[in-house]
Amino acid sequence: MEKELFHPKMESIAAKDQQRLEQDLLAEQIRYVYDHSEMYQEKFKTAKMTGRDVKVVQNLYRLPFTTKRELRESQKRKPPFGDFLAAPSDKVRRIHRTSGTTGSFVYTALTANDADVTHDCGARSFWAAGLRPHHRVVHCLNYCMWMGGYTDHANLEKTGASVLPFGVGNSR
C-alpha cells in the first residue's frame, strides 16, 4: 500500500504542536548561528541583540538583514566560505556557488546534515505534487556548481522515483 504522506509524523502534526515545534527549532537555529558565525555575532552586536532574542516567528523582523554584498565581502575577507559560515569547514560535504551574474559569485557550503534536510524538504514537495517511486523523471536541469541541478536530482531520488540525468551540457 502506498503511503499518502512522505513524512507522516511531520505532515500530520496538530497546528498547535507545529507552532511549538517551529518556535523551538527557530530559537535553536538562531542560537546556533549566533554561537558559531563570526559575521552574525557582529551583526547581532551592532543591532544590540543576542542569539536568544528571537524565539518566535513573529519576531523575525528584528533580525539584522544580510545583503549579497555582505556575503561577497565576507568571502573576500575570509576565503573561501567567509566568516558567516556557522559550521567547521572540515564538516562541509558539498559546495555550490551562485552564477555571479550580478557580481562575483558566492559559495554555499553544506554539511551532510544540511544536504539531508534539503533533500528531505525537496522530496516532500515532489511527493506532495504526486511524484511516487513508480515514476520515472527525465531531469533536464544543468549539472554545474549552482545548487538547482544536482540538488533537484537528489530530491527526486529521495522520493524513490527513477531519475534520468539528462541535463544540459557542453555540446562541443
Labelled PLM ranges:
Residues 115, 145-146, 171:
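Alpha-helix N-cap/loop-to-helix initiation residues
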Residues 127-163:
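Conserved AMP-binding loop of ANL adenylate-forming enzymes
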Residues 28, 39, 47, 149-172:
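Conserved adenylate-forming
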Residues 59, 141, 170-171:
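Positions that flank functional sites
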Residues 1-97, 102-120, 124-128, 132-133:
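Nucleotide 5′-phosphate-binding alpha/beta core
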Residues 110-111, 141, 167:
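Glycine-rich, histidine-containing beta strand-loop boundary motifs that form or position
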